[in-house]
Amino acid sequence: MKEVLKIANTSIFILIFFFNSSCKNQENSQVKNNKADSLAEVQKHLAENALKGLDISDGLDVHSFATEPMLKNPTNIDVDERGRVWVTEAYNYRPAINGNPTNPKGDRIVILEDTNGDGKADTAKVFYQGPELNAPLGICVLGKRVIVSQSPYVWSFYDDNGDDVADRKEILFQGIGGEQHDHGAHAFTFGADGKLYFNFGNEGKTLKDKNGKTVLDQDGEEIGPKKYQQGMVFRCDPDGSHVECLGNNFRNPYEVAVDSYGSLWQSDNDDDGNKGTRINYVMPYGNYGYKDELTGAGWEANRTNIEDSIPQRHWHLNDPGEVPNLLQTGAGSPTGMLVYEGTLLPKEFQDQLIHSDAGPNVVRSYSLQNSGAGYTASIINILKGDKDQWFRPADVCVAPDGSLIVADWYDPGVGGHQAGDQTRGRIYRVAPPTASSYLIFKQDYSTPAGAVLALQNPNLSVRYHAFTALQTFGNQSIPELEKLWNGGGNPKMRARAFWALVKLPLIDAKIYIDQAVKDKDPNIRMVAIRAAAELKQNLTPLLITLVNDPDVQVRREVAIALHHNKSTEAAAIWATLASKHDGKDRWYLEALGIGADRQWDLFFKSYLTLVKDPLKDAAGKDIVWRARTDEAVPYLAKLAVDEQVVLKDRLRYFRAFDFNAGTLKSGLLLKMIADNKNKDIGLNKLVLFALDNKSVNQSPIAQQALQEVIRSVFGTQEYIDLVKRYQVKSESNNLLQLAISKKDENIGKQSTGLLLSFGGSKQIWSVLNGKDSIAVKSLLSSLGQVGSKESIDIVQTIALSDKYALDIRKDAARKIGRSWNGEERVLAILKNKKVPQDLI
């Protein structure tokens, strides 16, 4: 039986993934070392030695706040207004995959508290434990309400009597995919606008309300795969109503961070091992490029103008309609993120993103700089586990005193749903040496003045209490809020006051929005646009006022505010914005694209009345490239065949044809082939990749060009793509040749699968039943990789039939399990004891 397992190349797969990446690109390793070199490996992992494996940035100290056995396997944390740390644990983490034991009582939500201010937790209370709680990934503490995210549910737990034990729980959302999966529902965050923000990974797929009804988005359309794909980020009211999908096509955004202006930031994980982890500034309603926007194909799929490197290719960054990445950080397993708006940490960390990444064992700051309509960022490490790579920061939060609280999953590996250790977990506190005591002063929410002071705290739970109190006070809050709003101080504090003012229940928000529109700070002018849109105000006068704003980021917000705006002035406003594009700023271009969504025909026509000739400069060519309307296609065709520009620089225009669905493009593309008197194969190839099957089949000239191009690219990925695209069944013999000759390459696998889809099983059997054993074994190798039922059936038939030579049968047996479906087939064969004796 052991030989059967060896022959079949599969039985029970135990996959343990270890992240051991340095993530050195763009990092400033401004850290001091707490040396752990002298410790033995076992000693290194003891709780009392936890700090010795960590490097901390200059000007900061790190202290153990809590360690096992007070907690284990923390996945997410929040810090409440009293400075207590709330922890979601995940002992019952993916047992079906990793085979680890489980606790039938379920996982826990634990409250850790430092009662004497020495910076160490003295008590650990279990807020909730239940068998339905299994590896939750998010927690958000809002007074007596605690929001916990665990696919398929998002629950609201309530502590009605204040005894730190949950009295009841309610479903906030449900139906979210990703149960017992890292790519499901993630944590909620309280925004300065009083809204809740959250996200889920690409297993989430849809969102349902507490009654099981699919939630509708801002357009009144269902949130699900018909409109959106992959990971998504959302905003809603605290009760779960008025849900907006603010972005889609991420892979696994872990936690969204919202600054006081209402800007959104989050990380996103690549397909593990491709060094494509990224940080995103989230422009509302944007597409973020994990899958092909049109086809849903993966990043590996060949396409015109494909990116040069895998990390760039990973996000389809050369495609029109993909919002750029703020930063790519290499390999990683990114987790929690925040915007640090406190003053306790050194200046370089203030008003910056702070992020935990469990893969490279690091908590980092991303130092932001404006760059056109977008941003750039550089990395400064805060806390790093260079000497102990079990350090797996799962989350980072800001305490009410401005210190950082870091959750450490603490495990030999991360990723692949594995857990090598189930009993350890740590919480660290990071603060300057002068703030070693953890003293949390009680806030006064009983008066407007006290609540306004609390509103300026860096901790989100404090700010939630303050915002809620101010809304309850109603118009009594106005004098104190106006002091902060009109005080000319920190613009982020002014923004918080502004949000609180415009959200007061009986206020005329337009008064403050009009003031904000005229503010000298562009950040405040941007907040005015966001607030007016959120409050469903008449945007037209505001947008007309700001359409010529000197700050490009304000104009970016004007463009985004035009998204699905049906006002009669919208097209002219957009045209004015488009005329101000500089031909270099991709952020601005994509904001224009978001603004024109579903209205490209109208908006582009308006643009043409303004600019007359869009091909006169790089800016106009960009607009044509980004446009999705038949009105732009003739200009696109001119750009594609402009021989004054090298072909490599025209690839983007050929790719842009894919994003224009109208019929006009087919005629123009066919004309390119007809006008190609020199029969430039490269040009015809690009045209054929932009055309559709029907147009090519109805055109003799295109058919001839297709045959010529196919011959020129034989044996390449482009050959496979064209034969598949146009279903060229006459290539069956050539596909069979490639299936045999390219057995160790992806081309061989694809050729075999394509041949089978063409009904070529007879040709395959003619080789397998032939006398050329080398060809037989080569074809079996390609068949084994295909993974379809038909291909597995063929290989299994060879392996189990005594009609074939034993060496051929053994070779076939080895090939059955070369695909995921093949592995399942092998297990079924073994389970049903169908293995012939001569193979054992």
Where are the predicted features?
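Bacterial Sec-dependent N-terminal signal peptides
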Residues: 1-32
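Hydrophobic alpha-helical membrane context
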Residues: 18-21, 96, 420, 537, ...
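Beta-propeller domains with acidic blade repeats across secreted/periplasmic ectodomains
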Residues: 25-450, 469-472
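N-terminal functional modules and adjacent low-complexity/disordered segments of proteins
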Residues: 8-14, 46, 55, 649, ...
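Long, ordered, helix-rich scaffold segments
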Residues: 407, 423, 430-840
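Alpha-helical interaction segments
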Residues: 7-9, 55-56, 117, 577, ...
